[in-house]
Design a protein with these regions (language model features):
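Short hydrophobic, aromatic-rich alpha-helical segments embedded in or entering the lipid bilayer
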Residues: 175-216
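Transmembrane-helix boundary motif in ABC transporter permease subunits
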Residues: 138-151, 233
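Residue-level signal for transmembrane alpha-helical positions in Major Facilitator Superfamily
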Residues: 59, 103, 107, 137, ...
Length: 241
């Protein structure tokens, strides 16, 4: 899996170049004018949410489409004929996609901090840990979603269905506390809600892993990754049953 993706230039471009280009545009728009009272730009405040969103979006799309190729090409069927258990198979795919997911997360974080020169507080190690847990969940979700698509076009059609509600309800555009009660309750089902909240707590408030709220959000992200990985394994069982 790693060798196959490494040889795909379009995949590398999607993972590395695309986030950098989009972040550059965002930085050009919101990274110049600072508040004279605080010295912070709009980008400084948006950075935690943007880091979470771009890390989640690109790797979710990649894993859904790539795993669908494994299904349609017969590769998955051949692997299922081996003594590997389905849980072990999903774990192998998670490791394969996870390597690229972590690379992308590192690129996004490094570019945001070093190239866009945002102001931040807290530990970058903690920021990367939150990113890492989030992208593992994104990979697991992509693997699970691929079971419901018959071709790449259908897989791509799941992207707005899954991501658009999170764009509006996770705190990316509007703080979750300002949402109506029903929408605020709905936001609790989205992983980006917890990732954005945890990243803001670290990068804006300067909190660390000793804070119980950050630990709770991390725990929820871990649980999300486990649930979606289990769903991905279950989808394979249904497929071959």
């Amino acid at each position: 899996m790693i060798l196959q993706l490494r040889g795909d230039r379009r995949t590398i471009a999607l993972l590395v170049v695309a986030p950098v280009v989009v972040l550059s545009l965002v930085g050009a728009i919101w990274g110049r004018q600072a508040d004279p009272r605080t010295g912070r730009t709009i980008l400084d405040d948006l950075a935690p949410a943007l880091i979470a969103f771009f890390a989640f979006f690109f790797i979710f799309l990649l894993s859904a489409v790539a795993f669908l190729r494994e299904r349609t090409s017969g590769t998955l069927e051949r692997l299922l004929a081996t003594p590997l258990r389905r849980g072990e198979l999903i774990a192998g795919y998670l490791v394969g996609f996870g390597v690229f997911a972590l690379l992308q997360a590192l690129v996004i974080l490094a570019f945001t901090v070093l190239a866009l020169k945002i102001q931040y507080r807290g530990s970058l190690g903690t920021v990367f840990l939150i990113e890492a847990v989030l992208v593992v969940g994104a990979v697991s979700l992509g693997l699970a979603v691929s079971a419901f698509a018959r071709n790449e076009l259908q897989a791509v059609q799941f992207v707005p269905l899954i991501l658009l509600p999170q764009v509006f309800l996770s705190g990316l555009l509007v703080p979750v506390d300002e949402l109506p009660d029903g929408l605020r309750q709905a936001s609790a089902f989205f992983p980006l809600t917890y990732a954005i909240r945890a990243l803001r707590a670290v990068m804006v408030a300067g909190l660390g892993l000793d804070d119980p709220l950050i630990l709770r959000d991390l725990g929820i992200l871990v649980a999300f990754a486990l649930v979606t990985a289990t769903a991905a394994a279950a989808s394979i069982r249904r497929e071959v049953a």
